[in-house]
Design a protein with these regions (language model features):
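Surface/interface-facing alpha-helical segments and adjacent flexible terminal/loop regions used
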Residues: 1-257
Length: 257
């Protein structure tokens, strides 16, 4: 995303964008199927896009609601798992290997390993109970969500400090306090879901890559997400036989610009 939105609300909108995108590409469950069928998914996408200053085409996602969970799962399997290979691999290492003209290998390729090191430097590890590469599109999107939440929290702290410096009391309004709690609760969820080296501990902002959540977010976007996700989104939109995945891919493409 290259829009100029900043501040706590801007970072919260970015976090919401990545959260929705990650949910869209993970193996579908009842939560996703229900949100798609009810129209909640498309409504959330439009709201988030609007908050980020992005315009979705008229009639976007009008055709996604008439789909059942079994159809989503069948298409997700065909696209992202496949036999003998996925129609549209969800792994950065595979896309980067193809671009470099080398044999793609899961886990043991330089790009997958770089993503794993980056996650660890942010205090995050492989989601508990899983053994999948950390360069899966949904995992990378969740990392970006986490960094955006951290940036939102830091922006609120900075606003309070600026208020104090200007002679105010630094106390948040009721709305700001509720916003801060919401951000904190979402950050805490990451500590309970991964098996990082220090479960329950959050890496200090100054110790994140680049010295801040914003810098870490920019670095991961430049070195990883923007390098391969546009091509992944384009392929997914072209290859999918189910309208939902076509629209999810077009949404990811809009978010990643």
């Amino acid at each position: 995303m290259t829009n100029s939105i900043d501040g706590p609300k801007g970072w919260q909108a970015r976090a919401a964008a990545w959260e929705l995108a990650a949910l869209s590409f993970r193996y579908p469950g009842a939560e996703l199927a229900g949100a798609v069928a009810s129209g909640e998914w498309a409504e959330a996408a439009r709201e988030i896009a609007g908050a980020l200053g992005l315009a979705l085409p008229k009639g976007w996602a009008d055709d996604v609601r008439d789909v059942e969970l079994h159809a989503l799962r069948a298409e997700a399997t065909r696209l992202f798992v496949g036999a003998p290979e996925a129609a549209c691999s969800p792994y950065e290492g595979v896309w980067r290997a193809k671009a470099e003209g080398v044999q793609p290998l899961l886990f043991v390729n330089p790009h997958s390993m770089a993503v794993e090191r980056f996650c660890k430097s942010c205090g995050l590890g492989r989601p508990e109970g899983t053994n999948e590469p950390l360069d899966a599109v949904w995992t990378e999107l969740e990392l970006l969500e986490y960094l955006a939440l951290r940036a939102a929290a830091d922006a609120m702290d900075a606003a309070a400090e600026n208020d104090l410096a200007a002679g105010g009391d630094g106390a948040p309004t009721e709305e700001q306090a509720e916003q801060y709690k919401e951000i904190g609760d979402e950050i805490d969820e990451f500590d309970t879901e991964d098996d990082g080296p220090e479960p329950g501990d959050v890496v200090a902002s100054a110790d994140l890559p680049g010295g801040s959540p914003e810098a870490a977010w920019d670095e991961f976007m430049a070195d990883h997400a923007k390098v391969w996700m546009p091509q992944f989104a384009e392929a997914c939109e072209a290859d999918s036989r189910v309208p939902f995945y076509k629209q999810a891919a077009s949404l990811l493409a809009a978010f990643i610009k």
